[in-house]
Curated annotation (Swiss-Prot):
Cofactor: (R)-lipoate
Disulfide bonding pattern of the chain: none
Main location: mitochondrion
Phosphoserine, modified sites: 131
NCBIfam families: gcvH, PRK01202.1
Keywords of this entry: Lipoyl, Mitochondrion, Phosphoprotein, Transit peptide
Keyword Translocase included in the entry's annotation: no
Family annotation (Pfam families): GCV_H
Organism: Schizosaccharomyces pombe (strain 972 / ATCC 24843)
Subunit structure: Component of the glycine decarboxylase complex (GDC), which is composed of four proteins: P, T, L and H.
PANTHER family: GLYCINE CLEAVAGE SYSTEM H PROTEIN, GLYCINE CLEAVAGE SYSTEM H PROTEIN-RELATED
Protein name stated in the entry: Putative glycine cleavage system H protein, mitochondrial
Length: 169
């Protein structure tokens, strides 16, 4: 089992303070009006302060690590995936990402049941480095408590969080 996540242990902030790339701002796509409709709210990407993301389509969320985290980790060489049909809660460990620099646990941003995993990461873990928020997704989770999404960050809030985190180091 991995000790403490690199993201939670302070490795990420110390690394990002020496490698200022503005990556977080790139990860935060422009959004439409902040007037939230139920459809928009449940179909956008949400972020955690531990640098995971979830993009919801209906009642299934696709989960991965953010571009900010992938940039800090560097070249990913191994990805530990969760078992399909596993029931998870917010904050549960659902896998790990190992790079040439460090290893980091991946935590579930939502509660539910893992419905599928990105099996292509077994042969191509570098997808997490090159396309962390598209081809490098970790798993899909059928949501059991969609209201949990309200406690996550939207694009703009996540970008601000990353900017503040960079400034504090």
């Amino acid at each position: 089992m991995l000790a403490r996540s690199a993201l939670r242990s302070g490795f990420l902030p110390s690394l990002t303070s020496s490698v200022k790339t503005g990556f977080c701002l790139k990860a935060a796509a422009p959004t439409l009006s902040m007037k939230w409709s139920a459809v928009k709210y449940y179909s956008t990407k949400h972020f955690t302060k531990e640098h995971e993301w979830v993009k919801v389509d209906g009642d299934v969320g696709t989960v991965g690590i953010t571009s900010y985290a992938a940039n800090a980790l560097g070249e990913v060489v191994f990805v530990e995936l969760p078992e399909p049909e596993t029931t998870v809660s917010v904050g549960d460990g659902i896998g790990a990402v190992e790079s040439v620099k460090s290893a980091s646990d991946v935590y579930s941003p939502v509660s539910g049941t893992v419905t599928s995993i990105n099996e292509s990461l077994g042969d191509s873990p570098d997808k997490v480095s090159s396309s962390p928020e598209e081809e490098g997704w970790i798993c899909k989770i059928k949501l059991s408590s969609p209201d949990e999404l309200k406690s996550l960050l939207n694009d703009e809030s996540y970008a601000q969080f990353c900017k503040e985190e960079d400034a504090s180091h």
